[in-house]
Amino acid sequence: MREIVHIQAGQCGNQIGAKFWEVISDEHGIDPTGSYHGDSDLQLERINVYYNEAAGNKYVPRAILVDLEPGTMDSVRSGPFGQIFRPDNFVFGQSGAGNNWAKGHYTEGAELVDSVLDVVRKESESCDCLQGFQLTHSLGGGTGSGMGTLLISKIREEYPDRIMNTFSVMPSPKVSDTVVEPYNATLSVHQLVENTDETYSIDNEALYDICFRTLKLTTPTYGDLNHLVSATMSGVTTCLRFPGQLNADLRKLAVNMVPFPRLHFFMPGFAPLTSRGSQQYRALTVPELTQQMFDSKNMMAACDPRHGRYLTVAAIFRGRMSMKEVDEQMLNVQNKNSSYFVEWIPNNVKTAVCDIPPRGLKMSATFIGNSTAIQELFKRISEQFTAMFRRKAFLHWYTGEGMDEMEFTEAESNMNDLVSEYQQYQDATADEQGEFEEEEGEDEA
């Protein structure tokens, strides 16, 4: 079967990753000891996409946990599903990267990377037909961003024809942990543009807004944010884990979603997002899911899709529902909002349907959009980067680890190129008649 090797790097990556394993273990009926207690054969049918079967019918996540300090991994180990992971797959250093990309990428991380690659090889060799890798990390810190991107490029060298998929938490202005986030993020994006096939851009600011506005949580914790991320990750990977009427794997997804190799940064979304209290007051229908899923308030990246146009979209519906209705609704969205989809890619919305809904819901939908509006996110990081870099603020932390200023300049211009590529395709029309229609569409919106 088509296996995926999961890697989580750094504090953020490990926390999101741990939550992801809790959610999908629950969906597959696997308890914290790795034993199966499910009630449906469908749960086991494609279990080996994410799990290895060990002696005594134990299922072990095909996960590799990486960090440059032991702290976060200790808390994962003592967390609810800590005992399910294979002990050899915890790879950690002692020194920490101190939110410094250079330490993660060139010094501390580079020392640890070989032992991580050994574990990656071990996991890949036990696969029947390896489909690809997924990495969870953040771009603002040191380990997830610096060492995460180092791992990506090393894995890319060794497995050039496998899909590389990342869930990357972008730094956001409202939720900032460190001053040097713009540096770390820009240096990381420089790597991601070249070395990944699909990157889901997740943004703490957007997650906060969802928790606050939609879920009515007055003081959202990181646990709440990570819960949203794991719901999305679970949705994105549904097709790979359960049989469905229209299945996708990582490669099919990439083929459908990436029109130009550099433009592979997706905005994920999820529906239904309802606060815990008001769940039973809403009937979930396919039209409602579709409408909610395309709503900018449901996007996990702090960009407004109405400010750009969709190059491609993938929607994954879960639950028992009529295929005909799903198709009608998706067409309906495209027809009503045609100005927001580029007209030079016909049929640019793909739908997949899986029969098994997530726990506690009758049906749900996960949205993956490749929208030119994502440039807002890169512009934001780029502005912050430029402000600091112009004064060479904090640069000594990076040059002290052996980095060169040239590398910063290159990363900056690569990011700006990315922004202008998105802009160029946003403005492109199949013929010049398109501009008039676009203005009309804006009046309605």
UniProtKB/Swiss-Prot annotation:
Modified residue annotations for N6-acetyllysine: K58
Sequence positions bearing Phosphoserine: S40, S172
GO biological process: one example: cerebral cortex development
N6-succinyllysine found at: K58
Tissue: High expression in brain, where it represents 30% of all beta-tubulins.
Chain positions found as Phosphothreonine: T285, T290
Modified residues (Omega-N-methylarginine): R318
Effect noted on mutating N247K: In CDCBM5; abolishes coassembly with tubulin subunits and incorporation into the microtubule polymer network
Cofactor: Mg(2+)
Post-translational changes noted in the entry: Some glutamate residues at the C-terminus are polyglutamylated, resulting in polyglutamate chains on the gamma-carboxyl group. Polyglutamylation plays a key role in microtubule severing by spastin (SPAST). SPAST preferentially recognizes and acts on microtubules decorated with short polyglutamate tails: severing activity by SPAST increases as the number of glutamates per tubulin rises from one to eight, but decreases beyond this glutamylation threshold. Glutamylation is also involved in cilia motility.
Keyword set, alphabetical order: Acetylation, Cytoplasm, Cytoskeleton, Disease variant, GTP-binding, Isopeptide bond, Magnesium, Metal-binding, Methylation, Microtubule, Nucleotide-binding, Phosphoprotein, Ubl conjugation
Amino acids binding Mg(2+): E69
Sequence positions bearing 5-glutamyl polyglutamate: E438
One Gene Ontology cellular component annotation held by this UniProt entry: microtubule cytoskeleton
Intracellular or extracellular location(s): Cytoplasm, Cytoskeleton
Pfam families membership: Tubulin, Tubulin_C
Molecular function per GO: GTP binding; GTPase activity; metal ion binding; structural constituent of cytoskeleton
Cross-link Glycyl lysine isopeptide (Lys-Gly) (interchain with G-Cter in ubiquitin): where in chain: K58, K324
Positions that bind GTP: Q11, E69, S138, G142, T143, G144, N204, N226
Chain residue ranges for the region called Disordered: 422-445
Matches recorded under PANTHER family: TUBULIN (PTHR11588)
Function: Tubulin is the major constituent of microtubules, a cylinder consisting of laterally associated linear protofilaments composed of alpha- and beta-tubulin heterodimers. Microtubules grow by the addition of GTP-tubulin dimers to the microtubule end, where a stabilizing cap forms. Below the cap, tubulin dimers are in GDP-bound state, owing to GTPase activity of alpha-tubulin.
Entry remark concerning the domains of this protein: The MREI motif is common among all beta-tubulin isoforms and may be critical for tubulin autoregulation.
Family: Belongs to the tubulin family.
Name listed for the protein in its UniProt record: Tubulin beta-2A chain
Organism lineage string: Eukaryota, Metazoa, Chordata, Craniata, Vertebrata
Gene designation per UniProt: TUBB2A
